[in-house]
Amino acid sequence: MLSRLIKRMLIITCCLLVGVGVLFIRWYIKSNIDRHSVYYIMNISHGRDAHPEFAMLLDNIDSMEQPEKKKVRYKPESGASGVFSDRFYIYNGANVLNDEEPILIKEDDFDGDAYVYYDNRGRMYTFDKTFKVRSAYDSKQHQDIDIKTVDQKALYDEIYKDFGFLIKANDKKPMINLQWLFNKKYYKRFN
């Protein structure tokens, strides 16, 4: 009778240990991929005109390092709609021009536009999930801008000037490199 009870206790203990181990491993893998997604995305091939490092940064901003920089504010959407929203705002007050502040936003993805960048000249650019430009709007002229006329290299250089410090702060090699798993999860999205 006693040996039967010991066997049951041993089996239950082993099952609990295996369950806790599996949960820990799954948590570690997810947190590793989220926290180091900028590093991983810099080491994956991606389509032309895509800048996926900003997409990964904004998708996983809660897990990312948010360096304290003078006049830079990080703000998740708050209020009743913010509880269910995935919106996140990054303001760079250091590059204000004519009271226009550069803002990088992660939007809800209802219409395929996942990210928005407001420059300090009153222009708004929307990007898809791979961080390719989808549309542009000039708020001072109150008109759409043909994206074929946008110098995309200059635009991305400007975004890097305003928010590139976030990429640099989060481009760190992880202790356990899970690049193969990241590639398996995100390769199709960026190619």
Stretch-by-stretch model annotation:
Residues M1-I25:
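N-terminal Sec-pathway targeting helices
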Residues K7-I11, K30-N32, H36-V38, N177, ...:
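N-terminal first transmembrane alpha-helix
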Residues G19-D108:
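N-terminal export/targeting and maturation segments
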Residues I12-C14, V72, D157:
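Exposed boundary/loop context
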Residues I12, G47, M64-P67, D162-A169, ...:
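Surface-exposed polar/charged interaction patches
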Residues K75-N191:
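Extracytoplasmic electrostatic interaction patches
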